């Protein structure tokens, strides 16, 4: 995409990546993304090998909600909820212009939750 847009790596100020699932508190590791088969993927660390700017990892529903809140249909409101259906079912929640990520960036995860070990 950068090449097609005529943008050099040195021109990037920040790189962002969104992933479904549960992320580490520091936003560096995809702890668990069942639908992708990921467990303990150090995604931000891997990206930092290729870019000389800061790298951020966000939950996909939170990233979608933030984009919709800032640039889309929610831009006129202080609080919004964005429901995502794709890599799972999730929600991004914005309250008073702040994303409410919750513990392990999973505050809006709606999809399948295991309640009993080995359960479905």
Predicted stretch roles:
Residues 50, 56-58, 71-120:
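Glycine/GP-enriched mid-protein hinge/lid loop-to-helix segment characteristic of carbohydrate kinases
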Residues 2-5, 10-15, 21-79:
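Glycine-rich phosphate-binding loop and adjoining helix at the ATP-binding site
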Residues 20-23, 86-88:
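Short glycine-rich anion-binding loops that position phosphate/pyrophosphate groups of nucleotides
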Residues 1-2, 98:
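An N-terminal domain-start capping segment
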């Amino acid at each position: 995409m950068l090449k097609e847009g005529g943008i050099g790596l040195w021109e990037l100020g920040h790189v962002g990546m969104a992933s479904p699932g549960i992320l580490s508190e520091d936003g560096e590791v995809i702890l668990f993304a069942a639908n992708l088969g990921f467990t303990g993927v150090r995604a931000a660390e891997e990206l930092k090998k290729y870019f000389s700017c800061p790298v951020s990892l966000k939950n996909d529903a939170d990233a979608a909600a933030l984009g919709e809140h800032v640039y889309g249909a929610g831009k006129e409101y202080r609080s919004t909820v964005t429901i995502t259906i794709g890599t799972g079912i999730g929600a991004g929640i914005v309250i008073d212009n702040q994303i409410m990520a919750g513990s392990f960036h999973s505050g809006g995860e709606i999809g399948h939750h295991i309640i009993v070990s080995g359960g479905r």
